[in-house]
Amino acid sequence: MSHHEPCLRQGEEYKYLRGKNSVYGDAWNFRTNREGITKFWEDGLKRSGKFENVITVGMRGEADTAIMGKNATLEDNIQLLRDVLKTQKKLIQEHVNPDLTRVPRMIALYKEVEEFFYGDEKTKGLMGAEELEDVILMLCDDNYGNLRTLPTEEMRKHAGGYGMYYHLDYHGWPVSYEWINSSYLPKIWEQMSMAYDFGVRELWMVNVGDIATQEFPLSFFLDMAYDFDRWGSRALNCTQEYTRKWVRQQFGSVEEETQDTIADILEQY
């Protein structure tokens, strides 16, 4: 599963398989290379569709970019995505399971895709679209650990449910933060507790970058997702307790005084 690579195929695969004589064509463009892109997705579903997956649907540009150029209108982008979603829906029914309610699928409403979902006062977005009826709608943070949006009471009726794409690491504009953990556990607790309380419970995804140095916040994020009753919104001020617990797990062979020092450093950094 990827937040932007649909139908169980990675963008890097297309990079190496594309070409003038390739069955997949030579352009990551659903308008000019519809047959090649459809074949690329179809082969991904044939190869991996019977395994346990959450299948990403939708389409973005190469390397985590917007799919259409700057001259494209909001309506242009929305109509393209509708066409893409209809094609992917048919492929998944043919090669994975005709009963789509038994196939976990998600679309990440990340960056420009969020705008295509909501639309504006003149252009109806994809919210409520038949093509997304049973699809998990993955909301996103702002790349810096702050939730951008949460489902309203009316939106929570969506059959596919909601997910959250959260960042502990980010490489991109306007500011990257990588390699050294700078994610404050109380903030993770606050934001993800809020997400859960607003019905975001189907799928949590976290961008951890290079795992080394991010083990601490990653462990908390995963433990919170696995046992929300223990570490979630009812567990007020639990992050200090979690820090001590995690330090004991990682540094159990050192003296208790040293463990306390390590925990203090983690809490105060």
Model-derived segments and their meaning:
Residues 2-42, 159-165:
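Active-site-adjacent "subsite" loops/lids of carbohydrate-active enzymes
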Residues 2-8, 102-109, 139-140, 165-167, ...:
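A generic structural motif
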Residues 6-9, 62-64, 113-114, 143-145, ...:
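Solvent-exposed loop/turn segments at secondary-structure junctions
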Residues 11-17, 67-71, 117-123, 149-151, ...:
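Short acidic, glycine/serine/threonine-rich loops at helix termini
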Residues 21-26, 64-75, 169-181:
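Glycine- and acidic
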Residues 25, 29-36, 73-80, 84, ...:
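Catalytic cores of large soluble enzymes that bind and process phosphate-bearing ligands
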Residues 30-159:
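Gly/Pro-rich turn-and-neighbor structural signature
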Residues 139-145, 152-269:
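Structured mid-domain segments that build the active-site/substrate or prosthetic-cofactor binding neighborhood
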